[in-house]
C-alpha cells in the first residue's frame, strides 16, 4: 500500500512539474511570440500530414477512421478483387496529387493570417487546439477547393470509371441516386483525414517538440 501511495505521489509530482513548465513557457509570451509558436506548430503539423498523402494514404489508420462510412464501405469492397485494388491505386494517386497541391498553399495562407490576439488561447487549447481552430476556420474552404481538383485527377487518371466498374452492380446503391457522389465522398474523407492527421502531428509536437521555438514554449 505504501509503495502504491508513493507511486501515486511521484506520478502526481511529475505531472504537476510538466504542467508548470508548460505554463511557465506560455505565461511570458507576447502576442507576437505566441503567434510565431502557433504558426510553427501548424506549419509543421500540416507538412507532416501532407507527407502521408504521398503513399498509400487509404491504408493510413488515422485516415481510415476519419473516412465517411460510404467511402469506407467502397474502399473495403474494392480491396476484395484485383480490379478493385487497381482502382484503389488510382484513387491513392489522385489523392496524392490533388491534396498536397491544393492544401499546402491554402493552409499556409490561413495560418499566416491568424490574429495575434488569438494565438495564446490556441497554444493553451489542448492537444489539437490549433488544428481544431484551423479546421473550423478553413475546413469548408479547403473542401470546396479540393472537390474540383480531386474530380479532375480521378477523371484524368481513369479512377472514376475504374471504381464504378470494379463495384459493379453495387455502385448504384453506394454512390449517386440521392447519395453523395464518389468525388464528394473522397473529398470529405480527404478533408477530415488531413485534419485528423494534422491533429495527431500537433499532439506529438506538443508532447515532444522538435522545433526550437516550440521547445521553448512547451518547456521541453
Question: Where does each model-flagged region fall?
Answer:
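Positively charged n-region of N-terminal signal peptides that target proteins for export
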Residues: 1-4
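Hydrophobic helical h-region of N-terminal Sec-dependent signal peptides
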Residues: 6-14
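C-terminal motif of bacterial Sec signal peptides marking the signal peptidase cleavage site
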Residues: 15-19
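Bacterial signal peptide processing site
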Residues: 21-24
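Post-signal-peptide N-terminal segment of Sec-exported extracytoplasmic proteins
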Residues: 27-78
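Mid-length scaffold segments of soluble, non-membrane domains
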Residues: 89-153
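An amphipathic alpha-helical core segment
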Residues: 141, 145-189
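A cross-kingdom marker for long, charged
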Residues: 189-220
Amino acid at each position: 500500500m505504501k509503495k502504491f501511495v508513493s507511486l501515486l505521489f511521484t506520478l502526481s509530482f511529475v505531472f504537476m512539474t510538466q504542467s508548470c513548465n508548460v505554463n511557465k513557457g506560455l505565461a511570458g509570451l507576447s502576442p507576437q511570440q505566441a503567434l510565431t509558436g502557433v504558426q510553427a506548430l501548424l506549419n509543421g503539423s500540416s507538412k507532416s500530414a501532407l507527407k502521408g498523402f504521398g503513399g498509400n494514404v487509404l491504408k493510413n489508420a488515422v485516415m481510415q477512421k476519419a473516412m465517411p462510412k460510404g467511402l469506407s464501405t467502397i474502399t473495403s469492397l474494392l480491396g476484395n478483387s484485383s480490379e478493385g485494388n487497381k482502382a484503389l491505386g488510382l484513387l491513392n494517386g489522385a489523392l496524392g496529387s490533388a491534396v498536397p497541391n491544393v492544401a499546402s498553399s491554402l493552409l499556409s495562407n490561413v495560418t499566416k493570417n491568424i490574429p495575434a490576439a488569438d494565438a495564446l488561447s490556441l497554444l493553451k487549447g489542448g492537444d489539437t487546439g490549433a488544428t481544431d481552430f484551423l479546421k473550423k476556420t478553413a475546413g469548408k474552404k479547403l473542401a470546396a477547393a479540393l472537390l474540383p481538383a480531386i474530380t479532375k485527377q480521378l477523371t484524368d487518371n481513369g479512377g472514376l470509371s475504374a471504381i464504378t466498374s470494379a463495384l459493379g452492380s453495387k455502385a448504384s446503391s453506394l454512390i449517386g441516386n440521392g447519395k453523395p457522389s464518389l468525388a464528394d465522398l473522397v473529398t470529405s474523407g480527404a478533408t477530415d483525414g488531413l485534419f485528423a492527421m494534422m491533429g495527431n502531428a500537433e499532439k506529438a509536437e506538443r508532447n515532444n517538440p522538435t522545433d526550437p521555438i516550440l521547445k521553448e514554449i512547451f518547456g521541453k
